[in-house]
A protein has these predicted regions:
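His/Asp/Glu-rich mid-to-C-terminal helical/loop segments that flank catalytic regions of hydrolases
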Residues: 92-148
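Metal-dependent peptidase/peptidase-like ectodomains
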Residues: 1-94
């Protein structure tokens, strides 16, 4: 479980939402400037898919108390940021996540190649640029540690 290592993780990214394309990310204000730098090249890699960086305007979310719901939950309940990419279907393939997800139809051939290719590039650029920051992302404004 290595709790001493969790404080060294900038963010846990979990891609488990169907074969749609990554179109943006929404981050707390304290992370915005870092993500602006990290995401700078993303709008120029494919004119078919824009990338939008947004500041989260909602209050910090409660720190989860249990490790249920998804793969990221254990990290979140231990205070690790678990910000995910925003995804969409701008070309209208009409992928129905709830019809396919975790069923016998949840197979590789349901993937949308142009979405997966673009998302792979976006993910690689963001991971590389985050990994090359000289500091971890701020956790300020992410979790409300006072909610019991």
């Amino acid at each position: 479980t290595n709790p001493e290592k969790l404080v060294k993780i900038s963010n846990y990214f979990n891609r488990d939402g169907g074969p749609t394309v990554t179109k943006g990310i929404t981050v707390p204000e304290a992370m915005y400037d870092d993500f602006k730098k990290v995401c700078e090249p993303l709008d120029s890699i494919n004119p078919d898919f824009s990338f939008e960086l947004n500041k989260r305007t909602s209050k910090p979310r409660p720190l989860p108390k249990t490790a249920g719901g998804s793969d990221h939950a254990y990290f979140a309940m231990n205070g690790v940021p678990t910000i995910s990419f925003d995804n969409g279907d701008p070309k209208g393939y009409d992928f129905n996540y709830m019809e396919i997800w975790h069923t016998e139809r949840d197979t590789y051939n349901m993937s949308i190649p142009e979405y997966m290719n673009h998302t792979s590039v976006v993910t690689a650029i963001v991971m590389y640029n985050l990994g090359n920051l000289d500091h971890l992302l701020s956790r300020e404004g992410l979790y409300d540690l006072n909610v019991k």
